[in-house]
């Protein structure tokens, strides 16, 4: 699988967050985004997963243009360095949240939550 950014940029209210950028990420390789605070690493990641839309350029997933595609339809997610959860929700609800957004069947959600909880040794907390 390949993720490609072609001339991708992002500006908000006239302020440039990401200058035009070309990148290729190939499956089976390790890629690292390094830079100081406010360099645009998170902004770039948000563009790649579809949380934000680029001002210019295209984002290709295995050659298919996904630039305007809804984040729910991309089948990708971003894992943050610091765990982000919803403190008002139970462990079960936190794990189930993305699956509910994708409108998965209740039985599938339950099975997947239990599988993930077991992998993370969180079953007693369900």
Question: At which residue positions do the language-model features occur?
Answer:
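Conserved coupling/switch loops of ABC nucleotide-binding domains, chiefly the family-specific signature
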Residues: 55-58, 108
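The feature captures the beta-strand-to-loop junction immediately N-terminal to the Walker
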Residues: 34-36
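Conserved ABC ATPase "signature" region
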Residues: 100, 107-125
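ABC ATPase NBD coupling module
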Residues: 64-78, 101, 106-110
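Conserved ABC transporter NBD signature motif
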Residues: 57-65
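Helix-to-loop junction immediately C-terminal to a conserved catalytic motif
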Residues: 49
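Conserved beta-strand
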Residues: 5-8, 16-26, 57
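Short coil-to-helix segment of the ABC ATPase nucleotide-binding domain corresponding to the Q-loop/switch region
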Residues: 89-98
């Amino acid at each position: 699988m390949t993720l490609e950014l072609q001339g991708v940029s992002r500006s908000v209210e006239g302020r440039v967050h990401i200058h035009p950028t070309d990148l290729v990420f190939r499956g089976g390789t390790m890629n690292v985004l390094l830079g100081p605070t406010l360099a645009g690493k998170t902004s770039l990641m948000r563009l790649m997963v579809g949380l934000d839309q680029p001002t210019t350029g295209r984002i290709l997933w295995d050659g298919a243009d996904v630039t305007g595609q809804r984040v729910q339809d991309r089948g990708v997610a971003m894992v943050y360095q610091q765990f982000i959860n919803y403190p008002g929700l139970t462990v079960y609800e936190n794990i189930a949240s993305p699956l509910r957004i994708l409108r998965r069947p209740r039985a599938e959600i339950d099975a997947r939550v239990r599988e993930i909880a077991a992998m993370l040794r969180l079953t007693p907390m369900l």
